[in-house]
Amino acid sequence: MTSERYNARESEPKWQRRWDDDKIFATQNDDPRPKYYVLEMFPYPSGRIHMGHVRNYTMGDVVARTMRARGFNVLHPMGWDAFGLPAENAAIERKVAPKAWTYDNIAAMKKQLQTMGLSLDWAREFATCDPSYYKHQQKMFLDFLKAGLAEREKRKINWDPVDMTVLANEQVIDGRGWRSGAVVEQREMNQWVFKITRYSQDLLDALDRLDRWPDKVRLMQRNWIGRSEGMLVRFALDAATTPAGESELKIFTTRADTLFGAKFMAIAADHPLALAAAPKNPKIKDFIDECKKRGTAQADIDTAEKQGIDTGIRAVHPFDPEWKLPVYVANFVLMEYGTGAIFGCPAHDQRDLDFVNKYDLGNTPVVCPEGQDPASFVITDVAYDGDGRLINSRFLDGLSIDQAKEEVAKRLETATRDGAPIGERKVNFRLRDWGISRQRYWGCPIPVIHCPKCDVVPVPDADLPVVLPEDVSFDKPGNALDHHPTWKHVTCPKCGGKAVRETDTMDTFVDSSWYFARFTDPWNENAPTTPDVVNKMMPVDQYIGGVEHAILHLLYSRFFTRAMKATGHVGLDEPFAGMFTQGMVVHETYRRKSGEWVSPAELDATMTIESIATDASGEAKTTTKRKVWLRETGEELEIGPIEKMSKSKRNTVDPDDIIGTYGADTARWFMLSDSPPDRDVIWSEEGVKGASRFVQRLWRIANDAAEIAKLAPADRPAEFGPDAIAVRKAAHGALHKVLNGIERLAFNVSLAHIREFANALADSLGKADKPTPDLAFAIREAAIILVQLVAPMMPHLAEECWEVLGQAGLVSEAGWPAVEPALLVEDTITLPVQVNGKKRGDVTVARDAQNPQIEAAVLALDTVKQALDGKPVRKIIIVPQRIVNVVV
């Protein structure tokens, strides 16, 4: 037995150098083997990797190493999602150039990732801020422009008047800019958009074919695309109350069945009818101005107090010319959704009910639950949105909701006004075109030129890339590109006159919407992709990343792939065949009495205190309480809830510290073993120590097995005895179960089977004092299989063990061992036992046991004896391999 401990600090750098020198993870595009493309979402170069990165990239690495061992040509690349606001913030706060800050961070994080022992093809590495990358992004923008998939249009945006920039909805907090604190204004500005809505139905339909995606992600995308079938209804406006030039109000509704419950109309603050009414009523103008100060995020609008102002305009009910409905400007209606106008049926929509209760407009229920008396059915504070029959609806009374919708549709489609139907069936989508303009410096320049004579002129392909200037200043608010003295001033490529560059840059989601395709051939200087290569290597077979990207990144990537197909850059629609969303890494939080958060690294030892108390019944109850102290002062700390690791709560653990103390393999093993990969993993120092102990245990098993392996014959024995068969069954059973777990991405299950197998092998080693040749052979075979099973998870340790066992080459290049199916067959079978049809227990017998042996084993069961209670047995019915029934 070896007494020498495994030394991760010496071993891990050694094998990392060996892998790098031998270039064993470099992928050849012309490799004839079947391809397998595994990709984890590439990181933003913030400067440090965190434990979430360790978990994410370890999962991908296990898949990559396993598929490589199984004979696939594995593509497993890495790059950097490098444009974005943090680099500009660093420039402002630390007076460092965004480019320098970004590339310094990339260098630091790459070094950290390399210590993890990931099987990455670093030759394909790029950063999205490399001009050699965004040159091709600019080319695709121009291709999209030619194809009508990119356009410039006026859009309502959130404007920060202090920072002088457009804010995303998420950057508006309580109506103020997240950084400046200024009151946000809504403005209309020219913005570049990608026409993602062209693919709304296709993006929706294709979700059904993404059967290796999580259901929750597909549901989130379905809801975001938001297909709804309804009617477009033209409400006439009462001429006596309506501004000149306005005659009707179009609304889209999915609940045309509730038209007889209408109590008001509501329009967006920027609806043409609202703008027409404002000049004659200062209160309407003031209300519209107030609405403009609020963000445009749907979530903010949904939670804000519902407010409106009566315009004095009246709309005419489509089924009753005498029925006039008040038209309100409302803060909860957006011009971007539907037609920017709605009819309010408060009895059956909670938002509408809150509104009418505020303005005392009343409500009339028009759908009554089945079995309830319509005469007594009333609505007060809670709207009814369930199924039922129509009431208070004239010709619709008694119909179901679907029948009522159909009847309304037929009548409105045949009724006309001014030669056009009053209503028509329509499909509406919640999805809106993707606005990509950002008033930021650190992003991909949009390759167009604005000429006073020629209008918008694309930058010629020969002049790409349009490169960002490096001599920029962030002393003034707004976009540094706007303030640059020379960069934006150019000659129009069409007329030769004076012109200016577009100073908006692209949304950083554009950069990450096609990087996976670029990885297939990042050396192509002439085009974004090499068609025969990208069509061979795509789609990504297994994509791994956080569920927070379920909508925007994944949906934009799906659109972008379709747009690339339409412009000849790829030949497929879907970029990711398989999608997996891993859980977060979470940790306890600790706080001082002053409220200051404390890092786990600052803790003294943790103590668990038990106390025994007697409850009201006199029974003694034991309770446990953990206590922690601040190392520096001895102050007892408050143990807070377990939360996602974050800098703000200081509950982070530095991967460098863990890898430096325990080694990368220990960190990898812990991240995989503690919980199912789609759930959060709770960081535990004890759990890490347990993983470290298992590393040492495997090292001892490998060394002990190596001693016995010296006694093994070179050739496979003709026969194996019972002990050898047991070892081989354990090995091949584990081989089958571990691979099954990896294929299902149930890494924690695979690791549990590895532990079970390691224990079984250790037991066999403990008993193998003087092993027979067949047992020595079986132990050597089992040890080799154990090392190969561990290799995807703990590759450095596996290489050391592989060497100790006398195996040639690298385990990272070894083929996956083959399972012998005969060794998966169990020798025993467990049968349920009934007495007079009622289950009384189970009996385990040899699979080939004869009926007399089964009967004897059944009658020997204590539970059967108790059930018989001395009664004679009439007969025993045995259904082979299924069940036994004793009849008395």
Swiss-Prot record:
This is Leucine--tRNA ligase. It is found in: Cytoplasm. One of its GO terms (cellular component) is cytosol. Its EC number is 6.1.1.4. PANTHER family: LEUCINE--TRNA LIGASE, MITOCHONDRIAL (PTHR43740:SF2), LEUCYL-TRNA SYNTHETASE (PTHR43740). Keywords: Aminoacyl-tRNA synthetase, ATP-binding, Cytoplasm, Ligase, Nucleotide-binding, Protein biosynthesis. The keyword Aminoacyl-tRNA synthetase applies. A motif ('HIGH' region) lies at residues 43-53. NCBIfam families: leuS_bact (TIGR00396). A motif ('KMSKS' region) lies at residues 644-648. It comes from the Bacteria. It comes from Rhodopseudomonas palustris (strain BisA53). It is an enzyme of class 6 (ligase). HAMAP family: Leu_tRNA_synth_B (MF_00049_B). SUPFAM superfamilies: Anticodon-binding domain of a subclass of class I aminoacyl-tRNA synthetases, Nucleotidylyl transferase, ValRS/IleRS/LeuRS editing domain. Transmembrane segments: none annotated. Belongs to the class-I aminoacyl-tRNA synthetase family. Pfam families: Anticodon_1, tRNA-synt_1, tRNA-synt_1_2, tRNA-synt_1g. It catalyses: tRNA(Leu) + L-leucine + ATP = L-leucyl-tRNA(Leu) + AMP + diphosphate. The keyword Aminoacyl-tRNA synthetase applies. InterPro entries: aa-tRNA-synth_I_CS, aa-tRNA-synth_Ia, Leu-tRNA-ligase, Leu_tRNA-synth_edit, M/V/L/I-tRNA-synth_anticd-bd, Methionyl/Leucyl_tRNA_Synth, Rossmann-like_a/b/a_fold, tRNAsynth_Ia_anticodon-bd. One of its GO terms (biological process) is leucyl-tRNA aminoacylation. ATP binds at K647. GO terms for molecular function: aminoacyl-tRNA deacylase activity; ATP binding; leucine-tRNA ligase activity. Its main location: cytoplasm. Coiled coil: none annotated.
